[in-house]
């Protein structure tokens, strides 16, 4: 799992673009600069890892574009030790960014292949998250309440069960 000077340089350029687009939270920028996005992508797309676009990761899912990850993460206003529920692990990139910011991350993925791949990768990267293979629609009431909840997959509505698992003010 190489993270070369080229990758680091490309991340610096990506950070400049995110700042130009209005991302101001230094913790978000630091986390995105620290997490090697290319490790979360299919080998066919490696040379595009730091382009601000979404790319396929299998099971008809995508790794979100960096701006989307930065924008949503900035909206969360993460504080160290926040207990965060992520619905839709996907590649694991968003969970890794949240973990890098000091969040205690619980992440759910319904696609078995993506769940196994992201769990293996994040474990290798020493990203200590709670991984659950399930449909995120019901959330994780056994671990509630959560300071923050982020839905990173397509959802026609916010399930009421998730709202009930959010701390007041979360």
Please name every model-derived segment.
Residues 77-169:
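Conserved nucleotide-cofactor-binding alpha/beta core module
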């Amino acid at each position: 799992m190489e993270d070369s000077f080229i990758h680091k340089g490309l991340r610096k350029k990506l950070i400049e673009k995110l700042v130009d687009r209005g991302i101001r939270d230094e913790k978000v920028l630091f986390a995105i600069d620290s997490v090697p996005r290319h490790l979360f992508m299919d080998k066919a797309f490696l040379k595009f890892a730091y382009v601000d676009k979404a790319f396929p990761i299998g099971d008809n899912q995508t790794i979100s574009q960096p701006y989307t990850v930065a924008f949503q993460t900035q909206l969360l206003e993460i504080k160290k030790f926040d207990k965060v529920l992520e619905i839709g692990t996907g590649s694991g990139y968003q969970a890794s960014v949240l973990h890098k910011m000091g969040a205690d991350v619980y992440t759910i993925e319904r696609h078995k292949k993506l769940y196994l791949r992201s769990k293996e990768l994040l474990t290798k990267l020493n990203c200590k998250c709670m991984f659950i293979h399930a449909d995120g629609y019901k959330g994780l009431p056994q671990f509630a309440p959560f300071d923050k909840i982020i839905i990173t997959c397509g959802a026609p509505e916010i399930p009421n069960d998730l709202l009930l698992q959010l701390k007041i003010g979360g």
